[in-house]
Amino acid sequence: MPKREDIRKIMVIGSGPIVIGQAAEFDYSGSQACKALREEGYEVVLVNSNPATIMTDPEMADRVYIEPLDAEIVAKIIERETPDALLPTLGGQTALNLAVQLTEMGVLDKYGVELIGAKFEAIKKAEDRELFKEAMRKIGLDVPKSDVAHDVSEALAIADEIGYPVVVRPAFTLGGTGGGIAYNREELREIAERGIKMSMINQVLIEEGVLGWKEFELEVMRDLADNVVIICSIENFDPMGVHTGDSITVAPAQTLTDVEYQYLRDAAIKIIREIGVETGGSNIQFAVHPENGRVVAIEMNPRVSRSSALASKATGFPIAKIAAKLAVGYTLDEIPNDITKETPASFEPTIDYVVVKIPRFAFDKFPTANQVLGSQMKSVGEVMAVGRTFEEALQKAIRSLEIGRYGLGCDGKDKEVTMEEIRERLRYPNASRVFYIRYALQKGMSVNEIYELTKIDPWFIDKIKNLVEFEEQLKQIAERMSIEEVPKEILKKAKELGYSDRQLAVIFNTTEREVRRVRKGKGLRVVYKMVDTCAAEFEAKTPYYYSTYEDENEALRSERKKVMILGAGPNRIGQGIEFDYCCVHAVFSLKDEGYETIMVNCNPETVSTDYDTSDRLYFEPITHEDVMNIYENEQPEGVIVQFGGQTPLNIARELEDSGARILGTSVDSIDIAEDRERFAELLERLNIPQPENGIAHSLEEAKEIARKIGFPVLVRPSYVLGGRAMEIVYDEETLERYITEALEVSPEKPILIDKFLEDAIEVEVDALCDGEEVVIGGIMEHIEEAGVHSGDSACVLPPVSLDEVTINTIVDYTRKLALALNVVGLINIQYAVKDGKVYVLEANPRASRTVPFVSKATGIPLAKIAAKLMMGKKLRELGVKEKLKLKHVAVKEAVFPFIKLPGVDPVLGPEMKSTGEVMGIDYDFGLAYYKAELAAGMKLPLKGTVFISVRRKDKNDRLLYLARKFKELGFRIIATDGTRDFLVQNGIEADLILKISQGRPNILDAIVNGQVDLIINTPSGKRGRTEGYMIRRAAVDYGVAHITTLAGAMAAVRAIEAVKSRKMVVKSIQEYHEES
């Protein structure tokens, strides 16, 4: 059936900020869908609150609304736009839940908007645990024994009947939020209470724990004519009990017999029909009992998901794009396969390689989080690798993670471990379990014993055993001969099993460079194979490659002039989707200039790894060895390392030493900015102030510096991204503890000590430079005071409290620095303003995480311009104009993962903790800030009770101003004794509430009972389980708005005041840009 002509305007809802469980994959699916719908001539209206996405670019839809994904605000947009249809299946759980709310509020009926892609009933049937269970019974499929509970006593009764352990799964939540595994009544009481609270309909499923069963997923698509295709099967390396987002996964499934696969395939087709997903993709999860083969259906997502992004990248089948076309009435046999151009989408993809996905965790940022993996997702990103064998793909994936490993061990990072530790690490799922399987095999543990401890299928353990045995063989050879003397076939086998040159260098006690030289001398070169959806039965038209060691190279060089762009690797805290955004913009911009673009990246969630973003895509780890192999195969004009965050910069020097040409700002200039001593010299020469500082190599040196410049000081290791291991230190005792710890982690790296400017205002600038001229992209004022990491602070553009003189000084310093560093492309500079004086904190001559936000707020596409400058264009000829004055105000706010990480203190500091960001835009700071907070999931109350408890140094005039404002706005104030005395002495009425240590009912009881609407609690700086910690943690767990800095509270009170007195404006980003 051809496309529908009765609908003209379609609204697409994005997934909002990046959180654990919902990451860049939805930018990828949303962008693909917008492109597909516009290709078909539909008018597209997009709503999403995340400015760091490609989908919110003004070019992606006819009208883009960067507004909170809040039902009332989306209802206003629907009223303004009156779309014919709403497509909610591409924005993750967020969009699905919004579609359900809008339907139930009657908004869709009122404006005659039809849900396409998935009907309301189908969403309900798949997401409501009770309805899903009934549907499975109806079609004769087995499900785990389970029952639905709406309160804790019901949950306990059900579990008693089923027997422990049980899995708790809340309805309508994402990434297992609020869920968990309970082994006894106490644990169940806690998990069920949390789960019921977090579920949109206050419902949890208590399910028989099918722990240790094998877990499989099928990616399925269906059209209106009831054609169903299976795109891909995915097998979880980790058994049931670990959330699939936290499991290592493998595609296609490796350990199913043909009969079992056919059974799952038939079951999946029955399920998608019964649930009634008329069009588009669904992800269906099964558990299979390892001994008796009993199969149970676990759950289904009636939408594009994290797994569908993986399935798309693994097979080359563009699920999101095709889902969008199916939603408007096409059938699968009418849509051509984009990669081959001659087969229709109704051909099921076949693959002749193995794909391995490994999650990336952020436990280094959250040392107090529980690191055992369970049914609630904890990873923040993932990598994918492709190889001809499981062993090769596994080692490449480990190398892609950027956790300092170059494969499965023998890379100079192995630890001495006891059998005791090994058993512990095998029994409890954790991020490094795969390394411990290797240790266990090396110590002689049998495959069967490892299986008993881990329930990981013996097939996988056998493959790891192959690596262990081969490594042993290599080590024996290395005792007898040098790498030069090793027979070629042994080296070839090592490369076929995925060993990196770095690993071989460790085994043969030589350097990576030497291994590379010998390998090439023996004629061992990598070849590239194509991902073409059809095992090479048809010719692929859009090339997408992976490396392996075979004979025939399928990536033949073209004659065009070409540029290579290095991506950002896996998402993690400190380096997220913002950098992918910059890479994609660079690709678009260079295509305009007539270059062939070559993208190198290993993150399956992103737009940069979409088969039709760049001209050629290499799905490879971003390491010196892998990048140089591609460079030699393609021989481009040069490589761009400015856009992928720290990842490409870490290998830039090595690439240059190996003969690659780095485009844009030179490696040496980057080094000046990163190297504290060289940078300080430069600032002195330019006569630009910076905070007093020193560099310590030992504890004694550190104490001496601190005495000289005076506490408080900011201490940190050199060369970091996202402020790893930074701390503000107020006394010598804390300094001693910090330095000792830091020297243990990296003894050879010096430690930087800066005078910490308390209460300074931080300001951040993104600018463009072509070596001769500088154009300021945007000046942002941070809302949180200095000491909160710039990635975690909210910021506002244009600045609201800086005077002309300060702004002119900042502009002047920015120009001087960019020219002195010979920047070609982008530079980001961070300043602190204190008592009217401007200090430079740091400069990064690369794309920063604020580039997308600034581009969205001003309408100047910074990354696109920067890419042209690197290719030799000048700002003058491109006609780029500064827009420092805007009619509107944009606020960027950070989004945090605390809800998914119990035990972590939700307090802001110099170490970055946020996973994503949102933007609020309006004509007034208060309204823009309110929208940003709402978009980040914090709905500021307009009435009710405010609890205030602050540390000693915050008991000042600002606090009094704040409290008076809250009183004027009609709030009741409650406070603990110290803060209350201070308020009352200054004539502000406040009621006393007990501290936790003073008895009951205390502040915790009030939070749990829902008697507090807003919490303002500034931390005392002590570590550990303080009362403040317990209050802040309760705020997160019970969903109460909470603020941990006075500056944040000042902004919040302005926002509340603004919303009570003025109306919020709802306008598309295109309209804002036209006005400025």
UniProtKB/Swiss-Prot annotation:
Mg(2+) 2 binds at E299, N301. It comes from Archaeoglobus fulgidus (strain ATCC 49558 / DSM 4304 / JCM 9628 / NBRC 100126 / VC-16). Disulfide bonds: none annotated. Residues 1-402 are annotated as: Carboxyphosphate synthetic domain. Residues 403-555 are annotated as: Oligomerization domain. Residues 556-939 are annotated as: Carbamoyl phosphate synthetic domain. This is Carbamoyl phosphate synthase large chain. Mn(2+) 1 binds at Q285, E299. Its cofactor is Mg(2+); Mn(2+).
